[in-house]
């Protein structure tokens, strides 16, 4: 499917590059049961748990009328590895920005296990 990438994903990607400059953001695009495409089963490790929390955060953001987290752009700043969501965001943007900010910080603190990249979702994420 050649759909455009949701706008917010670019911002989330840049946030990840702010907190984890040593890794490609692609390393997080298909990891465990929750990072990227998945969303079921038990998280395989702490990093995968970061993504589960991020998914849940987006689900909560969707409760805000008209809020579509994957498409919502927001205002933020990256300074020396520190992320700040800026005050110009409305309720939806502020919530989504915080979801992404907390996930990017979570990624920076979680060990990366190469064995959990591109796993078999059917086998391991029931």
Swiss-Prot record:
Q: Which Pfam families match?
A: Phospholip_A2_1
Q: Name the organs or tissues of expression.
A: Expressed by the venom gland.
Name the EC number(s): 3.1.1.4
What cellular-component terms does GO give this entry?
A: extracellular region
- UniProt keyword Membrane present: no
The annotation note on the cofactor reads: Binds 1 Ca(2+) ion.
Q: What class of enzyme is it?
A: hydrolase
Cofactor(s) this protein cannot do without: Ca(2+)
Catalytically driven reaction(s)? a 1,2-diacyl-sn-glycero-3-phosphocholine + H2O = a 1-acyl-sn-glycero-3-phosphocholine + a fatty acid + H(+)
Q: Where is the active site?
A: 54, 100
State the family named in the UniProt similarity comment for this chain.
Answer: Belongs to the phospholipase A2 family. Group I subfamily. D49 sub-subfamily.
Role played: Snake venom phospholipase A2 (PLA2) that exhibits strong anticoagulant activity, which is not due to the catalytic activity. PLA2 catalyzes the calcium-dependent hydrolysis of the 2-acyl groups in 3-sn-phosphoglycerides.
What name does UniProt use for this protein? Acidic phospholipase A2 4
């Amino acid at each position: 499917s050649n759909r455009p990438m949701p706008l917010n994903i670019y911002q989330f990607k840049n946030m990840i590059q702010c907190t984890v400059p040593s890794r490609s953001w692609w390393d997080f695009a298909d990891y465990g049961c929750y990072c990227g495409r998945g969303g079921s089963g038990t998280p395989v490790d702490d990093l995968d748990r970061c993504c589960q929390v991020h998914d849940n955060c987006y689900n909560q953001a969707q409760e805000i009328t008209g809020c579509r987290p994957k498409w919502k752009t927001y205002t933020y700043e990256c300074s020396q590895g520190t992320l700040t969501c800026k005050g110009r965001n409305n309720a939806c943007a502020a919530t989504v920005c915080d979801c992404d900010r907390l996930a990017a910080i979570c990624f920076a603190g979680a060990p990366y296990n190469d064995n959990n990249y591109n796993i078999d979702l059917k086998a391991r994420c029931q």
